[in-house]
From Swiss-Prot:
Name of the protein in its database record: NADH-quinone oxidoreductase subunit B 2
UniProt GO BP: aerobic respiration; electron transport coupled proton transport
GO-annotated cellular components: plasma membrane; respiratory chain complex I
Topology of this chain in the membrane: Peripheral membrane protein
Function noted in UniProt: NDH-1 shuttles electrons from NADH, via FMN and iron-sulfur (Fe-S) centers, to quinones in the respiratory chain. The immediate electron acceptor for the enzyme in this species is believed to be ubiquinone. Couples the redox reaction to proton translocation (for every two electrons transferred, four hydrogen ions are translocated across the cytoplasmic membrane), and thus conserves the redox energy in a proton gradient.
Subcellular location: Cell membrane
Lineage, top ranks: Bacteria, Bacillati, Chloroflexota, Chloroflexia, Chloroflexales
Keyword line: 4Fe-4S, Cell membrane, Iron, Iron-sulfur, Membrane, Metal-binding, NAD, Quinone, Translocase, Transport, Ubiquinone
């Protein structure tokens, strides 16, 4: 929160309230963040613990987990996002009213986690929707999620009405729904463009919070080699020993050629 004038604090103690529309508006939103009752995998167990009496999230106004996206302000993406579930996540996000926020909880929701190179796991929910706060861990403890909620409140305190995206103002306004991905021949697609291909290829995403428009590359962690799995894609060539992830090229190539098992 921005620094407050000591004279203003003294007047408030005497019952005289001096404020701005921004401060009053942000105070109302930060004090009533209603999460959506929405869990994907094991991180959701920690999210349930976060909502119990031990951590007392009622003091932040976030104890009301809503069953409908129409009544929710916050989506906590808790756990692994499979490519089959990804379109439903985007649909739920589009049904939430602005202002709406997203917390990416855990390594899987943020980057795919230990399943990053799998054929069925989305490598980060920010490929499809903007994320406000990331929570590392596998799984994160409830205290980490509580810290993420406090971090989100700090972000809300710094917002200005003339710059928020839901009023169509600012550098990159968002006034339409986010496109729902569909299944293509090699992965998730949006308008025919491959978003998260199978086989460890580079990632391209138009949505990376908070700037809404940067590109994200899947080669950041492994700049020297693009990891691919030949046993999943017959068209992949064994150009690097690490691509087979410990399997000899002969065995991997034999797996590609393996056809139906004979009855002999």
């Amino acid at each position: 929160m921005a620094d407050i004038d000591p004279n203003q604090l003294e007047l408030e103690r005497q019952g005289i309230l001096l404020t701005t529309v921004n401060r009053f508006y942000n105070w109302g939103r930060r004090s009533s963040i209603w999460p959506m009752a929405f869990g994907l995998a094991c991180c959701a167990i920690e999210m349930m613990a976060f909502g119990l009496s031990r951590y007392d999230v009622a003091r932040f106004g976030a104890e009301l987990f809503r069953a409908s996206p129409r009544q929710a302000d916050l989506m906590i993406v808790a756990g692994t996002v499979t490519k089959k579930m990804a379109p439903q996540v985007v649909r739920l996000y589009n049904q939430m009213a602005e202002p709406r926020y997203v917390i990416s909880m855990g390594a899987c929701a943020t980057s795919g986690g230990p399943f990053r190179d799998g054929y069925n796991v989305l490598r980060g929910i920010d490929l499809l929707i903007p994320v406000d706060v990331y929570v590392p861990g596998c799984p994160p403890r409830p205290e980490a999620l509580l810290h993420a909620l406090m971090t989100l409140q700090e972000q809300i305190d710094r917002q200005k009405l003339g710059r928020v995206r839901w009023y169509g103002e600012g550098d990159k306004p968002q006034t339409t729904d986010f496109p729902v991905p569909t299944f293509g021949a090699k992965g998730l697609e949006i308008d025919g463009k491959l978003i998260d291909p199978v086989g460890g290829l580079p990632l391209l995403s138009p949505y990376t919070s908070p700037s809404h428009g940067e590109h994200r590359s899947g080669q950041i962690e492994h700049p020297e080699v693009v990891r691919q799995f030949p046993i999943m894609d017959p068209e992949v060539e064994l150009e690097h020993a690490l691509k087979a992830r410990g399997v000899s090229p002969e065995i991997a190539a034999d797996d590609l050629k393996r056809g139906e098992v004979s009855n002999a």
